[in-house]
UniProtKB/Swiss-Prot annotation:
UniProt cross-references to HAMAP family, sorted A to Z: UbiB (MF_00414)
Gene Ontology molecular function terms on file: ATP binding; protein kinase activity
EC identifiers of the protein: 2.7.-.-
Protein name as annotated: Probable protein kinase UbiB
Organism per entry: Vibrio vulnificus (strain YJ016)
């Protein structure tokens, strides 16, 4: 390790010990390496023993900087790995850091765009509108249309910091996995690898631009969701330009009520937007925390969500959607055996799983949920309970489902903040049932035929020729099979003859040996010669 890496590693260990994060493992589970580290750095004591462990972890990550803050935010969504008293405080981590110099941001943009900003923009504000760990945002106007826009630029010094911290994270995860077998359940190496992919994706603003364009296209002319327009001509790996929007932050309940917003409809539309993305588009915004969601102040009686920051999105294939919809419907019908069978059929748990035991485990965990009214049941926690139970039966981590669960928890939490009486099941059930009708049954068959009709219309003129070629190939194949069969029969006959001759030869040789003992030397010699002759014939038969 370089001196810089050693210095950073010491800083990380120092913060961990000063916040008592070795308490994450009980004393009897501490491996030799962590115990030795704690004793050798005896001057580093827990400075916050009065605080709960979850709060100490949050404060430590906050002190370590932006890369670790975002890591903590990701861990807060992994409720399959961490209990609520750890995950809940991590959800409070704020990705806010001091802005860097506006002149430096401008220079960075000009380098990325290949010319002075004044060529394309006017009224560029050197004071950032917002600043986060990865990027910061400035406002300006397009010269050609006078449209207000925001320019998002990646921090110029962030990549080396991220690379260095990720390298240390990988090493620490590897050490933890090897030194502490009890910690392997938390899958430290896989968690860091997942975080690394997410973080590096966020460093490429072309991905975010493409995601925003796709999401905007999916909700063109929608009353439910508005996605600001992205200007691809001014967007690249380190800069993204998009339309500036004005709205009320979705967490500003007081502001929304003061504006006369229909809170019930707004909450229901949040659920509608989520399930539309998942089941209609198979493409969903996976970072719907309150900082990325605003409400259009116009037409408060018919409220519209505004989605920002499309850096993280999730996708589901048809099989995932089908099993997800069927799981929800089976769960709310309390058909736990069907839930268990679906997990096996989908390949989420091994095929040799005992269905009866799995069904019983699901029933124990999920049945108490129905003690509550349906309007109080959390979809997100339903998924969480199902996945946690399935993990005991060796369910592999499904990244797309982890993103879905995280997003569902966000949407559900926002919806119930806006309108506590929100009945998520009543709002979501029509989406699930309609999607199932479109996937199974006569309607699904008709839709499939419609979808494939252009392809078959294109191939229809070629059908007679293809049929003729297939028949010719079939005839040639039959002839070839006949030849192979005749050859096989001849070979078997030769082998049978060879075995017979070999057996006769062996018998004669044995007789020759017996005759030698009885002083019939001439007869013995003749018998031996005959036996060898039969062996030669058998060898020749095998060679053919």
């Amino acid at each position: 390790m370089t001196p810089t890496e050693l210095k950073r590693l010491y800083r990380i260990i120092k913060v961990q010990l000063e916040y008592g994060l070795d308490d994450l493992l009980p004393d009897h589970q501490l491996a030799k390496a962590p115990r030795w580290m704690r004793k050798s750095l005896f001057w580093l004591k827990n400075q916050h023993p009065e605080k709960p462990l979850g709060d100490r972890l949050r404060l430590a990550l906050q002190e370590l900087g932006p890369v670790w803050i975002k890591f903590g935010q990701m861990l807060s969504t992994r409720r399959d790995l961490f209990p609520p008293h750890i995950a809940d405080p991590l959800a409070l981590l704020q990705d806010q850091v001091s802005p860097f110099d506006g002149a430096l941001a401008k220079a960075q943009m000009e380098q990325a765009l290949g010319g002075p900003l004044e060529t394309w923009f006017s009224d560029f504000d050197l004071v950032p509108l917002a600043s986060a760990s990865i990027a910061q945002v400035h406002t300006a106007k397009l010269k050609t249309t006078n449209q207000e826009v925001v320019l998002k630029v990646i921090r110029p010094d962030i990549r080396p910091i991220i690379d260095a911290d990720l390298k240390l994270m990988r090493r620490m995860a590897s050490i933890v996995a090897k030194a502490m077998p009890e910690a392997r359940r938390l899958k430290p190496i896989e968690v860091v690898r997942e975080y690394e992919k997410t973080l590096l994706d966020e460093l490429d603003l072309r991905r975010e631009a493409a995601n925003a364009i796709q999401l905007r296209r999916n909700f063109t002319d929608s009353e439910e969701l508005y996605v600001p327009e992205v200007y691809p001509d001014f967007s690249n790996e380190t800069v993204m330009v998009s339309e500036r929007i004005y709205g009320i932050q979705v967490s500003d309940i007081t502001g929304l009520k003061a504006n006369g917003t229909n809170m019930k409809l707004l909450a229901e539309r949040g659920v509608s937007v989520f399930f539309t993305q998942v089941f209609r588009d198979s493409f969903f915004h996976a970072d719907m925390h309150p900082g990325n969601v605003f409400v259009n102040p116009e037409h408060p009686e018919n409220p519209q969500w505004i989605g920002l920051d499309c850096g993280i999105v999730g996708t589901l294939n048809s099989e995932d959607k089908r099993y997800l919809a069927e799981n929800f419907l089976a769960f709310f019908n309390r058909d736990y055996r069907r839930v268990a069978e679906l997990h096996v059929d989908s390949g989420w748990v091994p095929a040799d799983t005992n269905i009866d035991e799995f069904e019983f485990a699901i029933r124990i965990v999920c049945e108490p949920i129905f003690a509550k009214p349906l309007c109080e049941i959390s979809f997100g926690h339903v998924l969480l309970n199902l996945f946690n139970t399935a993990r005991r039966f060796n369910m592999e981590v499904q990244p797309q489902l982890v993103l879905l669960q995280k997003t569902l928890l966000y949407v559900e939490g926002l919806g119930r903040q806006l309108y506590p009486q929100l009945d998520l099941w009543e709002t979501a059930k029509p989406f699930l049932e309609e999607w199932m009708m479109n996937q199974v049954g006569p309607k699904a068959l008709i839709n499939a035929i419609k979808d494939r009709a252009p392809y078959w219309a294109e191939k229809l003129p070629e059908l007679p020729e293809l049929l003729y070629d297939s028949l010719k190939q079939g005839k040639a194949m039959n002839q070839r099979m006949d030849q192979l069969y005749q050859g096989y029969r001849a070979s078997k006959r030769q082998q049978a003859t060879g075995k017979f001759l070999f057996g006769v030869g062996a018998t004669l040789v044995v007789c020759s040996a017996i005759l030698v003992d009885h002083t019939y030397e001439q007869l013995s010699l003749a018998t031996a010669i005959a036996g060898v002759t039969f062996w030669l014939f058998s060898w020749r038969a095998y060679r053919r």
